[in-house]
């Protein structure tokens, strides 16, 4: 048993807190709002983000970051990618010095083009060997319901990866390890953009051939970007690559796919946001930062470019289709 702090009480953070608890650890979940923390403490349910799921009575919940982080051996960072830097700056002096930091965020930081593990290292000044990434085909509600799933723990330090692996292994949750942090993060960040494309396609009324083509060619451009950044090619055929991509592109539980469907049906970004309680899918923001990074590195990512066009340049879906189908002929 280890002491685990989960910083962030959204659907995924709450789910991972449940998994760590079910695996027999002492877990504290941090919620920014005391109102939410109090509700979870009293009802053992996160009605805002994970309604209908009963949380373990052993799970501690607080709105005090200092209280949540005290004595933690594993600190799970369940914070959206573009908010991670600001939160870490607040917690920097409170995070235990030798704790393993586990990133759940899937994105590339706007402006800096940094991966989330790089943001963590820069802000906290933690050695990269202390920073792990958890990623895979992990739709929160299915896991919270106890449906079997697998994931990847990527960390340069294999012993730390194994520590997290042992701590998060539950009867319904099987973690694997690798050392390819770059590939694991690139797969997780880019799949949100491809899922938006699949959602747009579905919302527009297109079928499974289109969906399969977007997933397959989407994986190809993700792997191109990963290779340029030094990732291991094998990562993209594994859980953090193809596994995560298929789940996110195919499931109605995927926020990115669902948001894309609304765009495909002709809704504006603002209307789609209103329909999702003011939340913008991660892929909308990531499409810009990933497109900018790809452009900077000279990596061809046509699907990402098209999604960026729809989300940020008022491109019509019909023009997106023409742009992708009208590209020059080439070998696969």
Curated annotation (Swiss-Prot):
Its EC number is 1.1.1.94. Disulfide bonds: none annotated. Pfam families: NAD_Gly3P_dh_C (PF07479), NAD_Gly3P_dh_N (PF01210). It catalyses: sn-glycerol 3-phosphate + NAD(+) = dihydroxyacetone phosphate + NADH + H(+); sn-glycerol 3-phosphate + NADP(+) = dihydroxyacetone phosphate + NADPH + H(+). The keyword Lipid metabolism applies. Pathway: Membrane lipid metabolism; glycerophospholipid metabolism. Coiled coil: none annotated. Keywords: Cytoplasm, Lipid biosynthesis, Lipid metabolism, NAD, NADP, Nucleotide-binding, Oxidoreductase, Phospholipid biosynthesis, Phospholipid metabolism. Sn-glycerol 3-phosphate binds at residues 106, 136, 191, 244, 254-256. Its main location: cytoplasm. GO terms for molecular function: glycerol-3-phosphate dehydrogenase [NAD(P)+] activity; NAD binding. The active site is at 191 (proton acceptor). GO terms for cellular component: cytosol. It is found in: Cytoplasm. InterPro entries: 6-PGluconate_DH-like_C_sf, 6PGD_dom2, G3P_DH_NAD-dep, G3P_DH_NAD-dep_C, G3P_DH_NAD-dep_N, NAD(P)-bd_dom_sf. The keyword Oxidoreductase applies. NADPH binds at residues 11-12, 32-33, 106, 140, 255, 280, 282. It comes from the Bacteria. One of its GO terms (biological process) is glycerol-3-phosphate catabolic process. PANTHER family: GLYCEROL-3-PHOSPHATE DEHYDROGENASE, GLYCEROL-3-PHOSPHATE DEHYDROGENASE [NAD(+)] 2, CHLOROPLASTIC. Catalyzes the reduction of the glycolytic intermediate dihydroxyacetone phosphate (DHAP) to sn-glycerol 3-phosphate (G3P), the key precursor for phospholipid synthesis. Belongs to the NAD-dependent glycerol-3-phosphate dehydrogenase family. This is Glycerol-3-phosphate dehydrogenase [NAD(P)+]. It comes from Corynebacterium glutamicum (strain ATCC 13032 / DSM 20300 / JCM 1318 / BCRC 11384 / CCUG 27702 / LMG 3730 / NBRC 12168 / NCIMB 10025 / NRRL B-2784 / 534). The gene is gpsA.
């Amino acid at each position: 048993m280890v002491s685990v702090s989960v910083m962030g009480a959204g659907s995924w953070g709450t789910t991972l807190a449940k998994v760590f608890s079910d695996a027999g650890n002492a877990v504290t979940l941090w919620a920014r709002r005391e109102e939410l923390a109090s509700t979870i403490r009293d009802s053992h349910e996160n009605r805002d983000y994970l309604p209908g799921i009963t949380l373990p009575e052993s799970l501690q919940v607080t709105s005090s970051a200092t209280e949540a982080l005290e004595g933690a051996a594993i600190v799970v960072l369940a914070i959206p990618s573009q908010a991670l830097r600001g939160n870490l700056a607040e917690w920097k002096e409170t995070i235990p010095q030798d704790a393993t930091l586990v990133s759940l965020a899937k994105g590339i930081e706007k402006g800096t083009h940094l991966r989330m593990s790089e943001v963590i290292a820069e802000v906290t000044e933690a050695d990269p060997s202390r920073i792990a990434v958890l990623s895979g085909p992990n739709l929160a509600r299915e896991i919270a319901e106890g449906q079997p799933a697998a994931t990847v723990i990527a960390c340069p330090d294999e012993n730390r990866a194994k520590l997290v692996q042992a701590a998060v292994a539950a009867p319904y949750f099987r973690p694997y390890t690798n050392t390819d942090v770059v590939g694991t993060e690139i797969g997780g960040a880019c799949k949100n953009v491809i899922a938006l494309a699949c959602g747009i396609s579905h919302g527009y009324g297109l079928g499974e051939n289109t969906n399969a083509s977007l997933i397959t060619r989407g994986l190809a451009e993700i792997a191109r970007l990963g290779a340029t950044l030094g990732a291991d090619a094998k990562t993209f055929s594994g859980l953090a690559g193809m596994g995560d991509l298929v789940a996110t592109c195919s499931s109605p539980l995927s926020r990115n796919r669902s948001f894309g469907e609304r765009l495909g049906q002709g809704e504006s970004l603002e209307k789609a946001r209103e329909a999702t309680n003011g939340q913008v899918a991660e892929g909308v923001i990531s499409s810009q930062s990933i497109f900018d990074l790809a452009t900077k590195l000279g990596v061809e990512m046509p699907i990402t470019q098209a999604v960026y066009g729809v989300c940020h340049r008022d491109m019509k879906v019909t023009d997106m289709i023409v742009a992708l189908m009208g590209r020059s002929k080439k070998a696969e």
